Amino acid sequence: MQERSDFPIAIIGAGFAGIGAAIQLKKAGIQSFTIFERSSEIGGTWRDNTYPGAACDVPSHVYSLSFEQNPNWSRRYATSSEIQEYLLGVVDKHELRERMRLDTEIVEARFDEESGSWFLTTNEGEAFTGRVVIAGVGGLVDPSYPNIAGLDQFEGEMMHTARWDHDVDLTNKRVAVIGTGASAVQVVPSIAPIVAMLSVFQRTPAWVVGKFDALYPNWLRRFLARVPFFLRASRFVKYWTSELRGPIVFFNSRILSRIGVALSIWNLRRQVKDPELRQRLTPDFQFGCKRVLVSDDYWASFERENVDLVIDSIEGIESKGIRTKDGSLHEADAIVLATGFKLGLATAPFPIIGRQGRTLDEAWAGGAVAYKGMTVAGFPNWFIMMGPNTGPGHTSVLVYTEAQISHALQAIKTLMAENLKYMDIRQDVQDQYNASIQKRMKHMVWGGCKSWYLNEDGSNHSLYPGFAAEYVLRTRKLRSEDYETAAF
């Protein structure tokens, strides 16, 4: 495709989505893009989450870009630092740094119908123009801090898992961990061997299945590097293994749920011998309606003499520790907040003003919706990566991300080839699509309990109700007739 200097493209965010989009644009011969990243380095999730034990919970060969496969993963489930190293290498290989604006936060985006352009404003007051915006800002970015009385009264060290302070030495310290979600199941077994005492405060137990992590031997990595076919085959097998397990996680089926429960109970029994402790660690909600966690050693940590599971509700935090509602004070030298992230899909990441001055927050007042999770009526030429109802509950998020990048690239090529000002998804098409998504939600397991998946009204605007392969097929071909267009 002939390069168009008059067709600037803005990519917001330098995580997997932004980097992947930039690579595919370059491969298509489109060089007129700029990547805006609010932090001083690329990486997104894997730049920020560096707590002990941080790792992906899907196999490494699937948790990587299909067009940048890596034969050198050291283990089945890559660590945070290894994933970040992979991303840094990909950025350097494709010479993307020259097109990046690091330490540059977009604070407002405003669409101009006359020019068919988005006007972006940075935190420094600079102005940029983009004919197309690819928004890869991520849905789980900013840490969520618990609403607990006295949070600022604690005299010891306190840190969120997503903002880990590596200057704090937890060796032989009394440590409290609040939360038992995805980060807790990784950090707890990682710090348990070094601390004097570890108190884990559990509000709700989680279903945890075996991870079966393992190191890859050097000979295997050399073999995969020399014979790329087997690297692709390994990815293929791991992907379809995750897909075929998907129904256990997301379909509202009593039989499938029992299979999931059996797998989790087996994992619990092999790690914990104390029946009373097993009872306290066993959830009472349907398998899959909250995020299913993976770990080989989280539950085993509670068998250690220096690890205590606290199930009493927290009353508040005091200068010396955590007070529970039974009156007990659990003294601590450090508190780790494993309390997850603010759900970025609930609101726009910054003011986004579309056609006729309507903001994205106004469009999403009744819940975040988008056509195929990517485009929102009234916000032309704006493509969301991992938008509403595109989260996976069973496989790699990158399968969805790559499908979205491909879809956005088709739209960009159409805009350029047909000399269009903009493409704006029709409201009726968007409404019809999202009605079908919510109808399918009735057959999914996620409505069976309260979780961050659900809005206050109980609707689910986070996850995709089906297989990743199906989503890829639904997004493979751009339907121009679904869009309102305007020519110059």
Identify the meaning behind each predicted range.
Residues 3-6, 10-11, 16, 20-41, ...:
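Rossmann-like dinucleotide-binding core of oxidoreductases
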Residues 4-100, 202-203, 270-276:
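Beta1-alpha1 glycine-rich phosphate/pyrophosphate-binding loop at the start
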Residues 70-89, 252-259, 285-297:
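Short beta-strand to alpha-helix junction loop
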Residues 82-100, 291-315:
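Helical element adjacent to the flavin cofactor pocket in flavoenzyme catalytic cores
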Residues 399-402, 406-488:
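C-terminal active-site-capping segments
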